[in-house]
């Protein structure tokens, strides 16, 4: 049993006749570490647990419910002595094996130890547990008599008078008893013990002639041993509902029970079975017989409304009449019987009701009723018994058993089982008849006790009329609203699965949706703006608020086949839009030059200082922009440009002494070629002052006007530099006149535009131009905050084979330092090094300072704004947000040339196949890539489509060669070189690699390549003309004698016979002879014979025209 003075939990529980869970709970209260019933504890710890269980301190709350095993011999002994018990208690014998159902007991402390004032509720001391075998040894069947019962009843009444119910309501919901629960005991204790328990727990009087001596001796024996009586069953508490109306109108106190310790519970007679729980087999007693005395037991209150209560758990006065007590804080053991009818076990039987508040019981226990009231109650019991005898049927024919439980015999209410003269159950006959009329409906209403117990009304709880109105509003639960059932039904209907719609219903619904969508799109916009001459059919339909099918149908009637993803040119868009009455406006190119980001923020206003101005030099090609900058910088940049034209944005900073102070100016040189429109717009976007260079001998040209529009879009002041005034034929006044037509009026003409005539070659008026620029910039009041993280714009970017991605950055606000983490568009970078325009390394760059920065993850897009962030995590998050848009933009650039126009699609339909020229474009900088792609868009593409498979800055690599070989593409390199191994790979794969330095030549060669893909045209070429002067018949045919008037005739050439200015025959010249000899051709002034196999009806005077078809190279034509 013990190992090294260790005791296991299950051994200790067996010794104490307790459940393992009780021992574990006691060990937990004593902080003894145990895990399960097989855990071992020391003898000292076991003694502590025993002392705690046997302790009678009322402050401790230890509730132990004992489930002792019942021996067979005890059961047999009880069975033999059962005859004495049957004389006072009517019950059916148990027929099941009693060994599997141990008797459940609930101990009780000695009544003398309880000194609790009823007005001050306190927690009830949890009774201790004693061994059932000891109780059985002391309580023998010989001492079972009525006197003992009466004496125990008197002790019980004393105990009840001092007992104050606990304030806490039961934690477990009431349990409805329908069938026998699992593990319910069937053992019958010794008759004396059983009778004592009936008297102490239920307060029932067994005999009309109690034996006082026997009662005293037995009570003394029990009290001395401190062995509380075992709980075998809970009696039925009944009331006389018609006897207490007068007192309940004025007081909550209910003092007179029907019998000592018995609660009056009308309506309990209709319960299907009360034997499904311990102690219910002694329910039918002879206490209602007419001769039974009604002793006044002050501790037991008369409790109306308890008739429907399934369980009296957690209330004083009822803890001895039940086993599965669930007081607040007491755990429910798995071995305890699960009563059917609880919210966990089954539907609630009719007549059961929710628990009554302990406060209500406290008020009901305070006073006793008089003897007169008792007599009235007994009389009413007789009347009710006679009335309800006819209407109440025995429920034993319909047994209810819980799962996995054995059947117990049900209590019968038949007339045969009643003793002569015994009064019937005290209840309202009408209410009983109503409940038994349709019990199934009643069960359905309260089938889930946990949810619907609030729906039990005052009638079902045993209170009716004025009795119910006496209860305090704080004690009674509110009624469940009648609308809850309808609401729940509506909710169920809402969650019901919808029927699957039929094909006809689906078609009808879709037709209605299409009609509604069409009506919603009837509102046409006032106008639409077409960006960059390109819109797909779907985009145009969205702008016009139309279905795409309407656009396709309109184009089809115009002889054009299109799809929803087809690109439309501006002319087609205007045609379609005018058909629907919507004008079209082309998106102005100047929008690219608008300043979209304000570099100065509100927190910078306190730390602003003056910054150098940024000046952008713009103008038409070959008007001397770079030469003017060379004169200012005193350098020779223009001579180094390929072809003498600028193809990059150059950023320079110049120091100029003005008013004995050195001033810094930042210049941006932009290309003047028409292909570099995006570069000019980008330069204008970041500028503070625009210098417009116009050649005095050439005047305003298209790019001059474009530069003016860029400057106006950027809202920057314009300074006009009239260059080349030293050349012959220069006319500055003519330039001023042309500019005045564009609303640029010179100051000497009364306008506000500064115009300075200069000569870049001879450096005339250069200082005056710089002074005017400084003057204009001072008016603009240019400021920045150097004490913040840098912000600015990417001017240019390219891929250097040694340095990696390199970007030209213009700092517009803040200070850029080495090591800063920045995000430029969707590109993340960390500055590894910075150099100025002279190639010198610098550590930081302030506002208006252009630098070349290294350290980007990839080549950034020119024109993107950059910003420095405090850490890489923040910058990476910003870059991630922009990644999607950047990928879409890059894809649009790569696929720009794939957009097929409608006219070229029509040509494809006519010719049978659309010619395509695949290109791979590599350039030195991102700006050059943009310029070339823009120029390719301007090429005629109605017959040959140019597809740019790859466009990126950087050198030509072997990967590019492999791509070109796989796709049959031509590689175009602009101002770039071939990587090591690329030339060898190109020769091996027979890939055509073209390198260019000037954009003119590049565009010309691409156009020639596109024309080379076109099939040549067959053109009719005239050979000569001859006149028929004689005819000769030869066999079946005829020969015409002709004279060559012009040109010549050739054998096998084509000829046309014209008679009276009408062509009567067209065919081949099959035979040509001169003087009977066959010849190949006959020239002008000679005579010859002409024969045709398919024509012989020659007439003198016919004209013969000889011609042949030759191929001619086709050229690209605009749409």
UniProtKB/Swiss-Prot annotation:
Where is it mainly found? cytoplasm
Give me the ranges of the annotated region G2: 644-648
Cystine pairings recorded for this chain: none
UniProt lists compositionally biased (Polar residues) regions at 116-153, 182-212, 242-257, 281-297, 319-328, 375-387
Region: G5, residue numbers: 759-761
* Domain tr-type G span(s) in chain numbering: 610-782
- Keyword terms: Cytoplasm, GTP-binding, Initiation factor, Nucleotide-binding, Protein biosynthesis
The segment annotated G1 runs over: 619-626
Subcellular localization is given as: Cytoplasm
Query: What CDD domains does the annotation carry?
Result: IF2_eIF5B, IF2_mtIF2_II, mtIF2_IVc
The UniProt regions of compositional bias labelled Basic and acidic residues, in chain numbering, are 70-102, 421-435
**Low complexity composition bias: residue spans:** 213-224
Which PROSITE patterns does this entry report, sorted A to Z? G_TR_2, IF2
Q: Where is the composition biased (Basic residues)?
A: 493-507
Enumerate the GO terms in the molecular function aspect. Answer: GTP binding; GTPase activity; translation initiation factor activity
G4: annotated span? 723-726
Q: Where is this region: G3?
A: 669-672
The family line of this record is: Belongs to the TRAFAC class translation factor GTPase superfamily. Classic translation factor GTPase family. IF-2 subfamily.
What name does this protein carry? Translation initiation factor IF-2
